[in-house]
């Protein structure tokens, strides 16, 4: 029997057993969703909010997280209407004309979708209509075209209102996110103990999926990027065989009760970092710690990212990998992505470090954000510098940089490193939710010496 067949047989048996012993999720309370709807009504100033259950985007039709946020359920072809008039009406229109699903929102009036065509023009006449623009075309088509809301006094996006609400997590949301984070941390610990030369990225991926399923969670994404794959910012997993001397860059997320975690870690396949790998790892870890230290209420949101970049560029200068830490083009060579975003109902949830708004926005208690600095050294990248940055620097400067940095860069070529934690902003500072996933070199190397039952199965 092939290795993949043995692995699948093991997972199938394990999941059947776990299905019998893991309790089902408890029914969720309607109260948080009712409170959110009331908050929207309070913000639309007598207007009418129209939130479809599904949105169209380049990847096709997707369930609206805003709709779920306000109702606690996903329903196809439904529209939630919140009227900010004196009656404060909350009406859900769907095909059945009745609620179909668990956790019935008792305060919602449910009507047939066919009623919406006649209801909406009257409800919004001379009032502000707040709509989800990404889903507006599909909603209007179902209602008979743009004439359905032509009588509104103004047509405005609902997204800013919902983003502001979703940005601050309730205690229930934080508890759910913590569970999702704990599941992901457990998956990381399992692969930390199991990973060894001769396994494949897919073998590691299978352990992660098993751990998620054990807790009735599913993967929101899984990156197991080893060796030369580790220098890719976004990756999945392949049948590539892990080799001694490789690092693996993990980027893992688990959906639990509609919320997702997001944790990145980097480990050495051999169980011990090489000196060069350790230098890069400690630099990235130092940058992350400095950024997390600054993630406190009242701090301008961009400051943690800027602090992490400063630590990285100064450290790269000490290693001989940059000649001028203040050079914009040298920054672009090494800083290849933003260092964080919000998490919640979406992996990138209504908030990102790279948003222009974050240069003025301040961090607030209840936000849950990632911090994920990374450095990547693809082989051959330095040779591309003269063509990559010819518009930013002279040919002489670029060639001199390559000549000076090239021998140093060669020592680190093929190394990728990213470290990501999920951080809750509190009233007095912050709390890292993902501490159960080891990130100190000594802890990683110690844990990689521990036995794993998966090594008896995946051979």
Where is each model-derived feature located?
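Bacterial N-terminal signal peptides
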Residues: 11-23
């Amino acid at each position: 029997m092939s290795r993949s067949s043995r692995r699948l047989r093991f997972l199938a048996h394990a999941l059947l057993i776990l299905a019998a012993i893991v309790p089902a999720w408890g029914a969720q309370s309607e109260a948080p969703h009712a409170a959110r709807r009331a908050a929207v009504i309070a913000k639309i100033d007598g207007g009418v909010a129209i939130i479809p259950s599904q949105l169209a985007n380049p990847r096709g039709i997707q369930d609206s997280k805003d709709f779920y946020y306000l109702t606690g359920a996903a329903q196809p072809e439904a529209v939630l209407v919140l009227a900010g008039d004196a009656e404060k009406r909350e009406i859900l229109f769907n095909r059945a004309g009745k609620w179909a699903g668990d956790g019935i929102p008792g305060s919602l009036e449910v009507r047939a979708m066919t009623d919406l065509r006649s209801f909406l023009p009257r409800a919004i006449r001379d009032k502000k209509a707040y709509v989800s623009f990404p889903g507006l075309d599909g909603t209007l088509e179902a209602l008979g075209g743009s004439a359905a809301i032509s009588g509104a006094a103004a047509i405005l996006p609902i997204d800013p209102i919902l983003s502001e609400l979703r940005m601050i997590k309730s205690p229930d949301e934080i508890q759910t996110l913590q569970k999702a984070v704990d599941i992901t941390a457990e998956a990381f610990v399992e692969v930390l103990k199991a990973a060894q030369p001769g396994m494949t990225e897919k073998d590691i991926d299978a352990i992660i999926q098993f751990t998620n399923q054990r807790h009735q969670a599913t993967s929101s994404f899984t990156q197991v990027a080893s060796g030369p794959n580790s220098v890719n910012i976004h990756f999945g997993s392949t049948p590539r065989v892990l080799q001694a001397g490789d690092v693996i860059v993990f980027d893992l997320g688990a959906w639990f009760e509609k919320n997702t975690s997001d944790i990145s870690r980097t480990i050495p396949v051999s169980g011990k970092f090489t000196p060069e790998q350790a230098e890069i790892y400690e630099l990235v870890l130092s940058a992350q710690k400095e950024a997390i230290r600054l993630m406190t209420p009242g701090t301008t949101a961009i400051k943690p990212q800027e602090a992490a970049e400063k630590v990285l560029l100064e450290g790269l200068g000490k290693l001989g990998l940059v000649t001028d830490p203040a050079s914009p083009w040298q920054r672009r060579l090494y800083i290849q992505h933003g260092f964080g975003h919000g998490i919640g109902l979406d992996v990138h949830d209504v908030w990102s470090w790279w948003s222009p708004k974050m240069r003025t926005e301040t961090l607030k208690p209840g936000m849950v954000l990632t911090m994920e600095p990374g450095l990547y050294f693809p082989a051959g990248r330095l040779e591309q510098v003269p063509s990559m940055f010819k518009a930013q620097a002279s040919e002489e400067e670029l060639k001199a940089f390559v000549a000076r940095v090239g021998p140093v860069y060669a020592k680190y070529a093929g190394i990728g490193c990213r470290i990501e934690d999920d951080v809750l902003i509190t009233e007095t500072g912050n709390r890292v939710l993902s501490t159960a996933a080891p990130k100190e070199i000594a802890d990683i190397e110690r844990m990689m010496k521990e036995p794993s039952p998966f090594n008896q199965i995946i051979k």
